[in-house]
């Protein structure tokens, strides 16, 4: 896989150069673009936003993230998502129309699959069915390279992940994503991803390396202190089944109101500078 990652070319210097000068290093690297859904916006707002992004990025392509599953984040810091099945499937249809014939990487619903194990049996079956329908709509209506998010290496056994993927995936899905928004090391993530591939031999995977330069702080996942930037985005992973290292989580964006951080998704300059100071030197 040879993928030309796009670095967003807008100028953030005026926002951060005075107070958080070290944070500017983050914006020299390709990052991802997350899409939920805002029912207050016009129906075609997200579709047009994706189309504009793809046009600006051409001939390079960005990494997109669909993040709107009902009961998103199971009520935690990033809670939200579509209110009904109908609204979710409509969101996926509009997302797919936005992508169209382009072929960006698409990370499908971070944490939604492993979070299904926390739900009641009835709610779990409903979520898996909804994800399966969403994936069919997505892969039938756009040319995106789709990876289903499966959590990180310290969450579920590889066999359980394989069984969950069997329930929802389809032949047009490229594979799965590992370590999105987490801090597990690249080596650990590669080993775990390969174990999952034993149960899904046709799959490939990508790893979020945005904040794993120092690895995890024990089991802390919400704004752990002392972490660092990981390997920059690349397709040169030296592992046949690992397609790419990506910065899926935008470094410097908070995990939530924990350990001194602002609400989830807000830029936190102090953390951003800490990540840069502790970055992995390749």
Where are the language model's segments positioned?
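Active-site-proximal beta-alpha loop/turn segments in soluble metabolic enzymes
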Residues: 73-78, 110-122, 146-152, 177-183
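Structural preference for beta-strand elements that scaffold enzyme active sites
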Residues: 32-33, 59-63, 103-107, 143-147, ...
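Surface-exposed substrate-engagement region within the catalytic domains
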Residues: 2-27, 153-273
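Glycoside hydrolase catalytic-domain context in secreted enzymes
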Residues: 67-71, 105, 155
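Active-site cleft segment of glycoside hydrolase catalytic domains centered on the general acid/base Glu
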Residues: 80-102, 110-144, 158-160
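Sec-exported extracytoplasmic/periplasmic mature domains
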Residues: 55-58, 97-100, 135-143, 166-170, ...
């Amino acid at each position: 896989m040879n993928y030309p990652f796009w670095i967003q070319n807008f100028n953030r210097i005026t926002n951060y150069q005075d107070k958080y000068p070290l944070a500017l290093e983050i914006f020299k690297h390709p990052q991802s673009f997350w899409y939920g859904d805002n029912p207050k916006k016009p129906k075609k707002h997200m579709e047009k936003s994706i189309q504009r992004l793809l046009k600006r990025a051409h001939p390079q392509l960005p990494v997109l993230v669909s993040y709107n599953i009902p009961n998103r984040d199971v009520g935690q810091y990033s809670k939200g998502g579509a209110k009904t099945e109908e609204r979710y499937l409509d969101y996926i249809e509009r997302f797919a129309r936005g992508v169209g014939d382009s072929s960006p990487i698409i990370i499908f619903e971070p944490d939604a699959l492993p979070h299904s194990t926390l739900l009641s049996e009835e709610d779990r079956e409903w979520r898996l069915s909804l994800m399966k329908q969403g994936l069919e709509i997505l892969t039938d209506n756009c040319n995106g390279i789709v990876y289903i998010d499966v959590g990180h290496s310290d969450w579920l056994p590889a066999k359980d992940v394989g069984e969950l993927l069997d329930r929802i995936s389809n032949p047009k899905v490229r594979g799965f994503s590992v370590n999105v928004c987490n801090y597990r090391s690249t080596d650990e993530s590669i080993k775990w991803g390969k174990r999952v591939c034993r149960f899904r031999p046709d799959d490939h995977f990508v790893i979020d390396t945005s904040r794993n330069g120092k690895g995890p702080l024990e089991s802390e996942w919400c704004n752990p202190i002392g972490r660092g930037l990981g390997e920059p985005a690349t397709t040169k992973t030296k592992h046949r089944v690992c397609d790419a290292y990506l910065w899926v989580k935008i470094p410097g964006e908070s995990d939530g109101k924990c350990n001194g951080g602002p609400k989830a998704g807000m830029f936190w300059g102090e953390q951003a500078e800490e990540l840069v100071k502790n970055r992995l030197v390749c």
